[in-house]
């Protein structure tokens, strides 16, 4: 399954907005997906990604699903945020 992060916007900021995105994703996109299914999180088209938004979305996805791959992470904002999550929240992707 591929999750297109840009569907939630191209400027992704704030913990409340991230929580709302995760709840929508959980209700409509990932609800019936087995935890063993490979998940690809695609950041194509995302201009700004903050650690607070990503911590509400990416971290719980990585905790729930066993096989998560990140796509199109070349953007410097996306890279910096992912590095921050890896450092401070033990993100293992």
What residue ranges belong to the model's regions?
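Amphipathic alpha-helical interaction surfaces in cytosolic regulatory modules
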Residues: 12-38, 43-91
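N-terminal presequence-like segments and adjacent domain-start helices
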Residues: 1-12
């Amino acid at each position: 399954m591929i999750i297109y992060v840009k569907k939630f916007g191209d400027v992704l900021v704030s913990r409340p907005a991230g929580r709302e995105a995760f709840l929508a994703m959980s209700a409509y996109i990932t609800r019936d997906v087995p935890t063993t299914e490979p998940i690809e999180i695609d950041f194509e088209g995302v201009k700004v990604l903050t650690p607070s938004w990503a911590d509400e979305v990416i971290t719980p996805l990585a905790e729930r699903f066993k096989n998560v791959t990140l796509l199109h992470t070349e953007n410097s904002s996306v890279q910096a945020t992912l590095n921050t999550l890896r450092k401070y929240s033990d993100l293992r992707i």
